[in-house]
Design a protein with these regions (language model features):
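PDZ/PDZ-like peptide-tail recognition elements
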Residues: 157-194, 226-277, 322-324, 333-355, ...
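Functional transmembrane alpha-helices
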Residues: 2, 137-152, 262-286, 294-297, ...
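Small-residue-rich helix-interface/hinge motifs
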Residues: 3-137, 430-452
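Hydrophobic membrane-targeting alpha-helices
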Residues: 171-179, 428, 432, 476-483
């Protein structure tokens, strides 16, 4: 059930993003008088689940039917000497078609829902794209086609999708900020008890109980942003307060690589172990532990904090151990049977207070812009790490499983929209990369045309697009292959 909930959230988020992205291309095309032949959610190879189109002023709807026949006849030609085949395309006389034949309505758009849930597309007349419509491109250019428009108009059409994804992220962040404000765990709050570190943090030179003073001389207000700060800014040192004095902890040269390979955060906040929940039927309930109890000892070992308890309790797997518990003014010693898993069935209560910043609607507007462009900048930095082999960031590339895993186990509307905004930014940044087959590839060739006043040939664009799609397919296979490999680790 958890997997299904995650999948549904992923599909819903991607559907919203694809529709918004393609709508950006669609509306820009219509503004400049370029016809849009098809607007589809998901891909419709061979047939579609649903489609509709306005023909002669009337809307027609079709369900689970094959795609419409082409508007061109393919004629095969064989060279009498070389025996090589070539093809020419002859337009069908649309006037001879039945009145309700969708091909007659060239000036309207066919909207539909495909059956392959890998995105969607907007088929713009006269444009070399993933459809590779050679029949259309072999005809004389028409005034309503993409290829006949000035370079600046084609440029706006191509960036329309990316622009709409950025706008969507801004609007979502404005809405979330205005309605919910911003909640975060401040570094100052964490410093009340100090941090706890795992083996990686310990290897860096950090210790349990350290209090974060600065990162490369900069104070980080939001505690949970510290790990990403270390990765994106290639931090040299962390200043901590330890035993009443400030200590500089210098990070090793391979810190970024190790952080990227690490599956969990190398630092966490530290809290006293006060039981917040006792799971029914587990060892803790059977032993008589209750909500509000504070565990201060496991056997003879002092466990003032939850991280101390976790380190000690695993030493007693499949054994009985005495826990010293504070219950109100009383100190109680309770024997508890520890199962093989090392988990006795309790959860710690959150005793730290999250900071909340409230925003009015008007204050939320500039905050929405700031947050969006900050996220864009951070994602660019992450991409630079991926293309730098020394960081090993390429090893962490993930596909649909990795994306789906970031959604919560149950639907939480705030978290859903927050992740949708983040994915919208990722889609915008990825699409603007100068790779043929992506919007950025088209933009690259258009900028070349503007600068040189020479338009790349259709043949060159077709080959470049094919190469780009092969590269993207390899990248897709690699990313999703990484996901599958991680499942079996």
């Amino acid at each position: 059930m958890v997997v299904l909930i995650k999948v549904l959230q992923l599909v819903l988020a991607l559907s919203i993003l694809v529709i918004i992205h393609e709508f950006g291309h669609f509306i820009a095309s219509r503004i400049f008088g370029v016809r849009v032949e098809k607007f589809y959610m998901f891909f419709d190879t061979k047939f579609s689940i649903f489609r509709c189109k306005k023909v002669n002023g009337k809307w027609y709807f079709k369900f689970f039917q094959k795609n419409e026949p082409e508007k061109y006849r393919t004629i095969e030609n064989i060279d009498p000497i070389t025996k090589k085949k070539s093809y020419t395309y002859e337009p069908i006389d649309l006037a001879t078609l039945p009145e309700d034949d969708w091909r007659r309505a060239e000036d309207t758009t066919e909207f539909g829902l495909g059956w392959i849930p890998l995105g969607g597309y907007c088929k713009i007349a006269g444009m070399i794209d993933e459809s590779m419509d050679q029949a259309q491109m072999a005809q004389e250019p028409k005034p309503w086609e993409f290829r006949t428009k000035p370079a600046w108009q084609r440029l706006i059409i191509m960036v329309g999708g990316v622009f709409m994804n950025v706008v969507l992220a801004i609007l979502i962040y404005i809405g979330l900020t205005a309605s919910c404000g911003e909640q975060y765990l401040s570094t100052a709050e964490v410093n009340k008890n100090g941090i706890t570190v795992d083996s990686l943090g310990y290897s860096f030179g950090l210790r349990d109980g350290d209090k974060i003073v600065s990162v490369d001389g900069k104070y980080i207000e939001n505690f949970h942003k510290i790990p990403m700060e270390l990765i994106l800014e290639k931090t040299q040192y962390i200043e901590v307060e330890r035993d009443g004095r400030v200590v500089k902890v210098y990070l090793p040269d391979d810190a970024v690589r190790n952080l990227l390979k690490h599956q969990t955060s190398f630092i966490d906040f530290r809290m006293p172990f006060i039981i917040g929940d006792v799971l029914e039927g587990e060892s803790a309930e059977k032993a008589g532990l209750a909500v509000g109890d504070r565990i201060i000892k496991v056997g003879d070992s002092l466990t003032l904090y939850f991280n101390d308890f976790r380190k000690q309790i695993v030493n007693y797997k499949s054994q009985e151990v005495s826990l010293t518990v504070l219950r109100g003014a009383d100190t109680i010693v309770m024997p508890v049977a520890v199962p093989e898993s090392g988990l006795i069935g309790v959860r710690n209560s959150m005793t730290l207070n999250f900071a909340t910043k409230e925003y009015s609607f008007w204050q939320a507007i500039p905050r929405g812009f700031t947050k969006t462009f900050t996220e864009i900048g951070d994602y660019w930095k992450q991409l630079k790490l991926i293309f730098n082999p020394s960081t090993g960031a390429y090893e962490s590339l993930g596909g649909f499983i990795a994306i789906g895993s970031i959604f919560p186990d149950s639907f939480q509307w705030q978290q859903f929209w927050r992740l949708t905004a983040l994915l919208s930014i990722i889609l915008a940044v990825m699409n603007i990369l100068p790779i043929p087959g992506l919007d950025g590839g088209h933009v690259l060739f258009l900028l070349y045309e503007v600068v040189t006043r020479r338009k790349p040939s259709d043949k060159f664009l077709e080959k470049a697009t094919t190469i780009g799609f092969i590269f993207l397919l390899i990248l897709l296979i690699y990313a999703n292959g990484n996901d599958i490999v991680k499942l079996f680790r």
